[in-house]
Amino acid sequence: MLGMYVPDRFALKSSRVQDGMGLYTARRVRKGEKFGPFAGEKRMPEDLDENMDYRLMWEVRGSKGEVLYILDATNPRHSNWLRFVHEAPSQERKNLAAIQEGENIFYLAVDDIETDTELLIGYLDSDVEAEEEEQQALTMTKEGKVDHSKGQLAAGSKGHLGCEEDFACPQCESSFPSEEVLTEHLQSLHQKPTGEKEFKCENCGKKFPVRQALQRHFEQHRKACRGEARFVCKADSCGKRLKSKDALRRHQENVHTGDPKRKLICSVCNRKCTSVSSLQEHRKIHEIFDCQECMKKFISANQLKRHMITHSEKRPYNCEICNKSFKRLDQVGAHKVIHSEDKPYQCKLCGKGFAHRNVYKNHKKTHSEERPFQCDACKALFRTPFSLQRHLLIHNSERTFKCHHCDATFKRKDTLNVHVQVVHERHKKYRCELCNKAFVTPSVLRSHKKTHTGEKEKVCPYCGQKFASSGTLRVHIRSHTGERPYQCPYCEKGFSKNDGLKMHIRTHTREKPYQCSECSKAFSQKRGLDEHKRTHTGEKPFQCDVCDLAFSLKKMLIRHKMTHNPNRPMAECHFCHKKFTRNDYLKVHMDNIHGVADS
C-alpha cells in the first residue's frame, strides 16, 4: 500500500470489531465534522463477484436512485485511509454515517467522538425512524382491523448515502435505506414459519405459508378501508382486491386460468416459471437460512452449507502433490498453480517467477524502500497492513494455538499447521535419492537437487555470480543493495532473511521453544536441539574420510580436517607434541593436561 496517508488527527491500531487494522481518533471529533471523500476504483455492478469484499465498497447513485457505479477500495493502491473504518456491530455503537454529495462519498460524525475511539460506520437515525413508520403502517390491532393511527409508509426517506432506498429486496419490490433494515425486512416478511405454524389473517381467518403473503393480504384490507381496490377476485376464494378491471383481468389470467403454464407463478412475488421444477427451485429464494454461529443469512441451503465449512476445523480437500489441506475445493485449484512450471510473471530484479499477476504485483513491493505502516509499540515500519498485523503478534505474549499431538504452542495458526504437517504427519514425502533429505513439495526438492548437480542457472544482475535457486539469488542481491527488509522490533538490527530475524528475536525474548524430551533442556533453534540429542544417543554422523574419526557436529569435523592439511600452520604442544588448529585449544590443553597456565 504505497503512499498511504493518514491525517495526524487519526491513528491506525488493531480493530476491536474485526480482524485487521482500525482507524482511531487522535483527538476529539465534534458532531457534524465531515471526512473524505472515500477513494476507490470505479466498477460497474456486473463486474463484481461473490468472492469480493463488499465491506470495502460503496454504491454511487444518480438523481433518480439508479446505481451509477461502485466505488471499490479493495485495492490499497486506489484507496485512502477511510478504508480502515469498519462497520459498527450495532446501530448503538456507530459514530459515523456515510453521505453522498454529488458523486462523492463522505463520512459524517453523528456524535461527539472522544480521543482514542475507533471510528465505526452506521446509518442515520432518520433512516431507522422511517423504517419503523413503514412497519407501524402495516400493524394490525387486536380486534383484527387495520390501525391507521400509527402513520403511513415513510415517503422519501433517504439511505445512508443520501439517496432514496439504496437496498432493494430480492424477493419483492420493496427497497430500504440500509442493509441492516433490509435484513430485518427479510427476516420478518420472507421467513417461513417453523413446524406447523402458519401466518393467519386476523380479519378474515385466511392462512398463508409465508409472512410476506400475509402482509400483501393486509394491504388488500387496508386499501378496501380507504375505498381503493374496488375490484375483488372471487376465483378459488382468492379475495384479492385490485384497483382496475384490467388489473383484475390480468390477475385472473395469470393466476386462475386453466392453462397449466399460467399456474407456474410464484405465490410470493408473482414471478413466472417455465416448469414445476423451476418454480420449486425459485421458491427456495424466499427462504432465509440462518447461520447459528455468526448469524449471517443465506438464500439457499447450499450457500449455508458452504458457509458452515468456514466455522469447521475440517479440511476435507487435499492437494495430491503436497498433501496440503483446504476447506473448499476451489481453494485447492487456486493452490495447485504454485506447483505448476508455468510462471509467466518474472521479477526483473531478483528473477523469481509467479503464476498469478496479483501475487507478482505484491512481490514487487518487497523491492521498494517505502514502509508507510508503523507499529505503535516499537515503531517498526512495514510495507503492508498485513505485515504490520503479523508483526503485532510478537508483542502478544499469548500463544493461543496449541498442538493436539504435543505440548507445543504457537501465536499463529498457520505456524501450528506447518508444525503438525512436518512434525506429526510427516508430510515431507519428497525425498532426495542422493542424500535422503526430505521436503514438503516437489519444487523445493528440485531446487535442492541442484546443490548436488552444481546446476546454477540464476544469475546476479550486479556481479554475474550464479546461483541454484531464486531464493538464494534474492538473498545475495541484498548484499549489493544493502536491503535488510526484516527489522528487529526490539533494536535497530536488520536482517536480509526472515529466518535470521526470528532467531535474533529470541535473544530478546529468551524464548526457547525446542525442548529435549530426555533432560528438559531447551533451545532457541531446532538445530541446537538436534545437536544436543546426540549427546544422549551417542550418534556421530560426521566421519573423517582420512582417519575414520567420527564427530557429533559438522563444525567439529571441519576443524578436525584442518589437522590433515600439511600446509596449514599448527599450534604444537612442546611437552607432548600434540597439534591444534587454534591457539586457544592449545592453551586449554596446556592448562588441563600439563598444568601450565598461559602467562
Swiss-Prot record:
Subcellular location: Nucleus
Gene3D superfamilies associated with the record: Classic Zinc Finger, SET domain
Stored InterPro entries: PRDM5_PR-SET (IPR044415), SET_dom (IPR001214), SET_dom_sf (IPR046341), Zinc_finger (IPR050331), Znf_C2H2_sf (IPR036236), Znf_C2H2_type (IPR013087), Znf_PRDM5-like (IPR017125)
Chain intervals annotated as zinc finger (C2H2-type): 167-190, 199-221, 231-256, 264-286, 289-311, 317-339, 345-367, 373-395, 401-424, 430-452, 458-480, 486-508, 514-536, 542-564, 571-594
GO cellular component: nuclear body; nucleolus; nucleus
Record keywords: Activator, Chromatin regulator, DNA-binding, Metal-binding, Methyltransferase, Nucleus, Repeat, Repressor, S-adenosyl-L-methionine, Transcription, Transcription regulation, Transferase, Zinc, Zinc-finger
Function field: Sequence-specific DNA-binding transcription factor. Represses transcription at least in part by recruitment of the histone methyltransferase EHMT2/G9A and histone deacetylases such as HDAC1. Regulates hematopoiesis-associated protein-coding and microRNA (miRNA) genes. May regulate the expression of proteins involved in extracellular matrix development and maintenance, connective tissue components and molecules regulating cell migration and adhesion. May cause G2/M arrest and apoptosis in cancer cells.
The protein's name in its UniProt record: PR domain zinc finger protein 5
Originating species: Mus musculus (Mouse)
Gene, per the UniProt record: Prdm5
